[in-house]
Amino acid sequence: DASLLNQLYNLGLDYERKRQYNKAVAVFKYVVAHDPGFSDVQERLQHNREVSEQFVLGNNKSSTPSDGTLIISNSGVQKPMIGRYVIDSELGRGAMGMVYLGHDPKIGRSVAIKTMSLSQEFEGDKLADVKERFFREAETAGRLHHPNIVTIFDVGEDQDLSYIAMDYLKGENLMAYAKSESLLPAQETFDVIVQAAEALDYAHNEKVVHRDIKPANMIYDRDNGIVKVTDFGVACLTDTSKTKTGTILGSPSYMSPEQLAGAKVDGRSDLFSLGVTLYQMLTGELPFIADSLASLMYKIANEKHPDIRMFRPDLPSCVSQVINKALHKELDRRFQSGSQMAKALIRCRERLSKKH
C-alpha cells in the first residue's frame, strides 16, 4: 500500500544519505516495481545506480575494496560526501587511510580530510578504546591555535570511517628535503626546525604530545618560509599501537628510546624525534639504521648516532652539540622544552651565518 511504499522510499533516501548506494538501489527497485510513478523514485533509482558504479566507500559489504577508499570519477554524477564535506579529489594515502581534498559547502572553505577505517585495523574492546582515544585527542588537538600548527576544524565519524577535517595547506612535506640530493641550505633547515620546536613548545604547554614527529608530518611552504606541524591527534593511534594483524604503526626510526619501550612519553620524546628530523634534513641520512626492527630498537636505546660532522664537516661544532643533546638517551639530559631547543638552534644558526 501507499504507506508501505512511502516508508520504503524514505528508507531508500536514508541509505542514499549514508552512501549505501547498493542498498538504496534495491529498495528503489522494489518501489518502482510496485508503483513506477511514485514520487521521483525513477530518478533516484537511476542516480543511485550511477553512483554505486562510480564510488566505493568504507566497509560496504556489497562493494569492494573495503579499505576506506573512495573511488572518485569525473563523470557528471553527484560527488560523495564525508560528514558535511563534499569530496573533490584524492590527495594521498596515509598509514591508516586516505587523505582527500574537500570543501564545506556551507561556507565554501577548502579542507584536507584524513580518513581512517579504524575497524579495519582494530577490533572488539581495542577498537572501542582506540576510537575513544582518537576522538578525545583529536578534539584536544583542535583547540591548538599556533601559526606553525595545522588547524583542525572538525572530527567525526561517518559509517565505518573516522575523519579529521583540517586546513588545506600549500607546500610539500619535509621528506622532499630530507634526501641527500635535495637538501635545503643549512640555515633554511635551521629556520624550519626552529618553527617546529616553537610549535611543539606551545603544544606541550597545552598538555598535548604529538608522538609522531617526522619530516612527513611537517608541511613546508617554501614561498613564504612557513612550516606547519600536522597530524596532532592522529598520532595517538600510531604510538606503537599494534593492529589486529600485529603490525606496529608509526615510524620507529624517529621514535625515542622510551617510546619504543612502550613507556609513557612527554614532550621530550617529541624533541628527540625533532632531533632525528634535523639530522636527516642536514645529511639525507637517518641517525639510526638497522636491518630489522629489533636491531633498530636496540641501536636507538643503546648506541650513539654517528657524529653529524662525519657527513657535514662544513657545519660548525654547535650543530653537533644541538643534535647530541636532542638525541640523548637520558631524558634529563635532553632539551627540556621546545623553547630551549629553539633558542639553541637560533644561537647556532647565527654561528652558521658567520661561517658562510
PLM features per residue range, with description:
Residues 88-95, 99:
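Protein kinase glycine-rich loop
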Residues 117-143:
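AlphaC helix of the eukaryotic protein kinase fold
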Residues 155:
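Activation-segment/catalytic-loop signature of the eukaryotic protein kinase fold
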Residues 159-173, 177:
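Conserved short submotifs of the Hanks-type protein kinase catalytic core
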Residues 192-193:
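Activation segment signature within eukaryotic-like protein kinase domains
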Residues 198-208:
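Protein kinase catalytic-loop region centered on the HRD/HxD motif
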Residues 200, 219, 251-354:
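C-terminal lobe helix-coil module of Hanks-type protein kinase domains
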